[in-house]
Amino acid sequence: MLRLPDEHRALFRNPFGTLYPEFSMVLPHLAGRAIYTVGDVVTANILAAGILPAIAIIDGYTRRLPCPPALLHQARQILVKNPAGAITDELIAAIGDAAANPPALIVVEGEEDLAVLPVILAVPDGGFLLYGQPGEGAVLCTVDQQAKERAREMLALFEQV
């Protein structure tokens, strides 16, 4: 398991892509690309827009409050445990499985926020990762070699436990 040390948490407050204050501003950019979502609200919004994400990762909460479950009837579900501030081997394996066999809904018992990094590394270049930035909007990240390098650099800050 990888754990994010407290001294590096502030680095993860910066968007890992372009921040859009309104979800509707993201939609015109999504046509023709594989979409990957991390977070309950952004997943619910993408489904409401009629888009089925290749991978959706949720934990049932938004800003630490219960969130109605995203309904992905066309996707198989993978259940994993992942504590806050960590990335477990179980989560990484589930993301790899989902990337190889989409669509998939990964339901996390615990916290899904840091799943952004292993998703970027697991999926092919050319897709879009979409996740919520609490209180600010939605972040859209183009998955490419630059994003993968940044994800590797950020993962290097984690401790193996």
UniProtKB/Swiss-Prot annotation:
Binding, GTP: D40, V41, V42, D59, E112
Domain of life: Archaea
Keywords: Coenzyme A biosynthesis, GTP-binding, Kinase, Nucleotide-binding, Transferase
Enzyme class, UniProt record, top EC level: transferase
EC number: 2.7.1.237
Associated pathway: Cofactor biosynthesis; coenzyme A biosynthesis
GO MF entry, a single one: GTP binding
Catalytically driven reaction(s): 3'-dephospho-CoA + GTP = GDP + CoA + H(+)
Keyword GTP-binding: yes
GO biological process, one term: coenzyme A biosynthetic process
Family statement drawn from the similarity comment of this UniProt entry: Belongs to the GTP-dependent DPCK family.
Protein role: Catalyzes the GTP-dependent phosphorylation of the 3'-hydroxyl group of dephosphocoenzyme A to form coenzyme A (CoA).
PANTHER family the record matches: GTP-DEPENDENT DEPHOSPHO-COA KINASE, UPF0218 PROTEIN TK1697
Record protein name field: GTP-dependent dephospho-CoA kinase
Organism from which the protein derives: Methanosphaerula palustris (strain ATCC BAA-1556 / DSM 19958 / E1-9c)
